[in-house]
Amino acid sequence: MDLLKECREELEYAVSVRRYLHENPEPAAHELQTVRFIVSELEKFGIEYLNIPDGGVLGFVRGALPGKTVMLRADCDALKMTEAPDNGKAPKVCVSKVPGLAHACGHDTHTAMLLTAGKVLAKNRDSLKGTVILMFERGEEGGGNIYYLLKYMREHQITADACFAQHNDPLLPVGQIAVSPGPRFAGSFGFHIRLTGVGGHGSRPDRGNNPIDCFLAIAAQFKDLRMRMIPPDVLFTASINMVNAGSAHNITPETLTFAGTVRTYDFQKGIRFREKFREIIEKNCEIFECGCEFLRWKGPTIPVINQNEATRFARAMSESVLGAENVSDNIPDLCGESFGVTTAFFPCVLAAVGSGNAAEGRTAPLHSPYYDPDEDSLLYGSAYYAACAYGFTDADLTFNFEPFQEELEALYKLTNRPIPKRLDP
C-alpha cells in the first residue's frame, strides 16, 4: 500500500484539523474542548475509543486480521503565551483566537497527524493486522496527565508491543525525518529555593546576615559539583537561571530566591546530582546560619531514550515513506518530554518530523511566538505514523525490552514528582 499517497489524499483534512486546533488552543490539563473534538472525529471514522478523565483519549483501530498491538502517540495541549501574527518574514495562515494561549510547540500538528493516520488506517482496516491504539495525551506541558492514561491502561490490562511517537522540528526541513537509537529528550530536574537571613543596613553587615553570601557559596559549589561528578563526554547541563534579592544598594536583604534546571540522559546520575546538591544547600545554610525553603524540588524526570531495535524498525519505515536520502540521525535534545514516562513501560521511539521552511520564514524554534510550521509536515508525520502501524503489525518482530516492574506510583516517587491533581468536572 502506498501510504504516502493515502495520506496525501487526506492532507486537506489534516490541514483543516490543525487550523481548528491552532485557533482554539487549551492549556495543559484543561483540554476539554480539544478532547470533544478528537472524540467526534474518531466517531466519524467508526473508531472505538475511551475518553479517560484527566488523561486523554485512546482510540482503537482493530484490523480484520489477527496480529500484534502497536500504539501511536500524540500530545494535544498548548502553551500559556501570546502568539505573533507573523513568523518574522510573512503573515501566518492561522493564529490563536484565545488571548494568552498558543500552540507554539506544534501539538496541534501532532494531533492532526494522528487523526489523519487513524482515518487512513480505519479506511483500510480490512488489510490491517492486529490493533492500533491511538493515544492522545493531555497535559504534556507540565500537566502530568500521562499518569492517568497509563494508570487506566495498567488497571484494565491495555497493553502494546511497541509505541511510536514523533515531534515536529522546525529546525529540520519539511520532507525529512530524523530518528536514531539512544538519547532523544532529556530528563529534567527543577529547583526553586528561598534563603532567609537577617536584614539590616548595608554599612553594618556584622549586624545582619546577608543571604547573598550563602547563595554565592552554593552557586560556586553547584558549578563545581557538575565538574566533579559528571564525565565530560556525558550530555549534562546544570544552570541557575533566576536570582532575586534586595531592594536598594544600602539595604542588606532578608531573603534571596534562586531557581534553575538540570538536564541529563542518565537518570541515575540525575538522582545522585540532586542528592548532593541538596547537601550543598543545607550545609551552606548551616554554615551561614540561613534558613532554607525548597519551593520547588522536582525530578529528574524520565529521559526519552529510543529503544535500539524499535528505532531501527522506525527508521526503515521512515525510509520506506520518504526515501533513505531524507532520513537522518536525530540530534539529542536537552528539552524535557513527558513521553519518557511511557518509555518506562513500552519499547518506544520518538522521531523528529521536519516542519521547517527557510524560504517561507518557517524556522522559528519551538516555544517561540514566531513558530510557524510548514503544513506539508502533516503529510509526512501522518504517513510516518501509518507506516509504523502497518509495518509493525505485519512483521514478526519482538523487541528486547524490560519494562518498569513496580507500580506507576513508585516511578513517580523515584522522580520526586507528585501525583497530578484531578481537574476534570
Named regions from a protein language model:
Residues 1-103, 108, 112-129:
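Acidic/His- and Gly-rich active-site-bordering loop/insert found
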Residues 21, 59, 72, 107, ...:
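Divalent metal-coordination and catalytic microenvironments
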Residues 26, 75-77, 139, 169, ...:
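Active-site beta-loop-alpha junctions enriched in small/polar residues
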Residues 38, 113-121, 149, 215-218, ...:
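Buried hydrophobic packing segments
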Residues 71-73, 82, 191, 350-355:
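Non-cysteine beta-strand/loop elements that form the S-adenosyl-L-methionine
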Residues 79-81, 92-102, 108-109, 121-242, ...:
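Histidine/acidic-residue-rich, glycine-tolerant segments that coordinate divalent metal ions
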Residues 216-425:
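Metal-dependent amide/peptide-bond hydrolase catalytic core
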